[in-house]
């Protein structure tokens, strides 16, 4: 009889927040199924989905982005492995609102120290901001109470989604 190595899965719990139409639900679906769909309906309240990538079990909380749901973001961001803030990098008209909502969320004492991953989504759209411009517009350099990372993705581009999931898996393994 040979002993199998203990390949106990690592676990990650992520809350995906951001303004409505930033691509949170599309992102969850692409990470879970590998397929993108144009036919998304706005999330009412929240949805939760579990996926496993490279022996890492990831629980994704997809939170509604409409103004009436933003008051619940903080509650679902407590005690998670990471807050994932999704921004439509092509929607420059709403960046100031997105920045304000992000900084309001991060000002909650219950969330101090929880790592932040900002995802600039929809980079396939002409006029989408660069990583540097998004970092500046979102005021990420002023966020000092936690680890902060910014990645640029398109839910329509499997390569960027693979890079994101690789980053999440590696981040999970480096923390455990």
Curated annotation (Swiss-Prot):
Interacts with tubulin. One of its GO terms (cellular component) is spindle. May play a role in lysosome motility. May play a role in chromosome segregation. The lineage of its organism: Eukaryota, Viridiplantae, Streptophyta, Embryophyta, Tracheophyta. It is found in: Late endosome membrane; Lysosome membrane; Cytoplasm, Cytoskeleton, Spindle. GO terms for biological process: cell division; chromosome segregation; defense response to virus; protein transport. This is ADP-ribosylation factor-like protein 8d. Keywords: Cell cycle, Cell division, Chromosome partition, Cytoplasm, Cytoskeleton, Endosome, GTP-binding, Lysosome, Membrane, Mitosis, Nucleotide-binding. SUPFAM superfamilies: P-loop containing nucleoside triphosphate hydrolases. Belongs to the small GTPase superfamily. Arf family. Its main location: membrane. GTP binds at residues 21-26, 40-43, 62-66, 121-124. It comes from Arabidopsis thaliana (Mouse-ear cress). One of its GO terms (molecular function) is GTP binding.
């Amino acid at each position: 009889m040979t002993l199998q190595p203990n390949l106990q899965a690592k676990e990650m719990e992520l809350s995906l927040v951001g303004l409505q139409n930033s691509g949170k639900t599309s992102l969850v679906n692409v990470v879970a199924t590998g397929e993108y769909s144009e036919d998304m309906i706005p999330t009412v309240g929240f949805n939760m989905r579990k996926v496993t990538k490279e022996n890492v079990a990831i629980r994704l909380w997809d939170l509604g982005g409409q103004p009436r749901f933003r008051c619940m973001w903080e509650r679902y961001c407590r005690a998670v492995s990471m807050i994932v803030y999704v921004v439509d990098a092509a929607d420059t008209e709403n960046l100031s609102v997105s920045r304000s909502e992000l900084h309001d969320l991060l000002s909650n004492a219950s969330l101090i120290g929880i790592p932040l991953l900002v995802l600039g989504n929809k980079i396939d759209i002409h006029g989408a901001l660069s990583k540097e411009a998004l970092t500046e517009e979102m005021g990420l350099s002023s966020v000092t109470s936690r680890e902060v990372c910014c990645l640029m993705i398109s839910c329509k581009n499997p390569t960027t989604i693979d890079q994101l999931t690789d980053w999440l898996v590696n981040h999970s393994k480096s923390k455990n």
